[in-house]
Amino acid sequence: MRYYGSYYRGLGYGCGGFGGLGYGCGCGGYRYGSGYGGYRYGCCRPSCREGYGFSGFY
């Protein structure tokens, strides 16, 4: 469940700690709306704070 961060929870909190939303996890995740409801997050890497990492999935 590495690429299930935003997609799995629907919010995408874990990469950023922006109020529990986490837009911008690695390289431009926020640009695609990683915290807008589970869209594509560019190429986030498994380095989130909550433990939900995105391995460059979209």
Curated annotation (Swiss-Prot):
Keyword terms, alphabetized: Keratin, Repeat
Signal peptide: none
Recorded GO CC terms: cytosol; intermediate filament
UniProt keyword DNA damage, yes or no: no
Role noted for this protein: In the hair cortex, hair keratin intermediate filaments are embedded in an interfilamentous matrix, consisting of hair keratin-associated proteins (KRTAP), which are essential for the formation of a rigid and resistant hair shaft through their extensive disulfide bond cross-linking with abundant cysteine residues of hair keratins. The matrix proteins include the high-sulfur and high-glycine-tyrosine keratins.
Quaternary state and interactors: Interacts with hair keratins.
Similarity field: Belongs to the KRTAP type 19 family.
The protein's name in its UniProt record: Keratin-associated protein 19-6
Organism: Homo sapiens
Lineage, opening ranks: Eukaryota, Metazoa, Chordata, Craniata, Vertebrata
